[in-house]
């Protein structure tokens, strides 16, 4: 489908707005992946509050100008699938890594978080970041263990005396 100038401007504006609201961005090469499989990925992304776009490189480059992801402009080459994490910085990375395990042809290219370009190892670290709820849960469990541990030690000291 041919895009006229107005449609291209709308796409650029839309992607720019999403980029300004997102916490991190990840790119992948979707070639050799069927549309049906990409649509399944989109459904999972929607559930996890991740915006996914397959967009022309020139439009993506123009929409990333004057955003915190502008470093990506010089790197973009070939077919691109872009994922924007909207709530948690590692959510798009986590989704792409899980998807990559099931689909070997899906190649994760780059990610940017806090104005830094991440390599594949850093992308995995970003994906392993706990979410807000996971962090709070771990903290509460830690507090319970600390208080229970003290209580048990007190009981042991009482029984020894």
Swiss-Prot record:
Keyword set includes tRNA-binding: no
Pfam family, one: Ribosomal_L10
SUPFAM superfamilies assigned to the protein according to its UniProt record, in alphabetical order: Ribosomal protein L10-like
Key words, A-Z: Ribonucleoprotein, Ribosomal protein, RNA-binding, rRNA-binding
CDD domains: Ribosomal_L10 (cd05797)
Gene Ontology molecular function, alphabetical: large ribosomal subunit rRNA binding
Cellular component GO terms, alphabetical: ribonucleoprotein complex; ribosome
UniProt-listed Gene3D superfamilies: 3.30.70.1730
GO biological process: translation
Matches recorded under InterPro entries: Ribosomal_uL10, Ribosomal_uL10-like_sf, Ribosomal_uL10_bac, Ribosomal_uL10_bac_type
Assembly information from the UniProt record: Part of the ribosomal stalk of the 50S ribosomal subunit. The N-terminus interacts with L11 and the large rRNA to form the base of the stalk. The C-terminus forms an elongated spine to which L12 dimers bind in a sequential fashion forming a multimeric L10(L12)X complex.
Function: Forms part of the ribosomal stalk, playing a central role in the interaction of the ribosome with GTP-bound translation factors.
Protein family: Belongs to the universal ribosomal protein uL10 family.
Protein name: Large ribosomal subunit protein uL10
Organism: Buchnera aphidicola subsp. Cinara cedri (strain Cc)
Lineage of producing organism: Bacteria, Pseudomonadati, Pseudomonadota, Gammaproteobacteria, Enterobacterales
Name of the gene encoding the protein in the UniProt record: rplJ
């Amino acid at each position: 489908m041919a895009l006229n100038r107005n449609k291209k401007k709308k796409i650029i504006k839309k992607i720019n707005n999403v980029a300004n609201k997102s916490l991190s961005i990840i790119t992948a090469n979707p070639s050799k992946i069927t549309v049906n499989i990409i649509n399944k990925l989109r459904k999972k992304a929607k559930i996890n509050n991740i915006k996914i776009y397959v967009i022309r490189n020139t439009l993506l480059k123009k929409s990333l100008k004057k955003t915190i992801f502008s470093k990506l402009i010089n790197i973009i080459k070939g077919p691109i699938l872009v994922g924007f994490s909207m709530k948690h910085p590692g959510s798009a990375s986590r989704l792409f890594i899980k998807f990559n395990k099931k689909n070997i042809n899906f190649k994760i290219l780059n990610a940017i978080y806090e104005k830094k370009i991440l390599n594949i190892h850093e992308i995995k670290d970003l994906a392993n970041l706990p979410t807000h709820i996971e962090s709070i849960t771990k903290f509460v469990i830690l507090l319970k263990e600390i208080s229970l541990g003290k209580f048990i030690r007190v009981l042991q000291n009482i029984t020894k005396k």
